[in-house]
C-alpha cells in the first residue's frame, strides 16, 4: 500500500516542475492564430484583439502565424496588398486559388455552405464577411512570408501565413 501511495504522490506532481526552465526573450516566441465560431462580433472584437497581439508580436520581433487559407477567400486581395514583396503577394493569391480549385475538382463550390448555418444564425450573411473577420487576426503588419502546411516557421518573422485547411484541428496541427 505504501508503494501505491508513493507512486500516486509522485505522479501527482506537475510535469512542469520536472522540466528544466529556460528564460527566453519575447522575440523568440511564435504564436499561431485560429478562428473559433464566426459571428459578427468576431471581426469587431475577438479577432481584432488577436490582431493587436499579432501586431505587437511583429513589433517586438516575434512571429505570428495567420492560418486557415479557406477563410481568406473573398479577402485575399487585402492580405496580398500587405505582402512584403510581389513574391509574397502572389503566393497569397496562389494558395487561395489552389484551395478553390481543389474544392471545385471534387464537385463543390466553397461558397456553397459558407457562411455556415451557424455563422448565419450569428448574423453573418456572406463568405466575404466571414473572411474579413478572419483576416483581422493578422492585425495590420506586413505579411513577410507564406509557409506550406506544417513547415517549420522561422523565428523573428513578424506576421506570416501558413497555408492550412479551415478545419480547426487540422489547421492547429499544421502550425
Each language-model region and where it sits:
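Anaerobic metallocofactor- and corrinoid-dependent redox/one-carbon enzyme cores
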Residues: 28, 33, 39-175
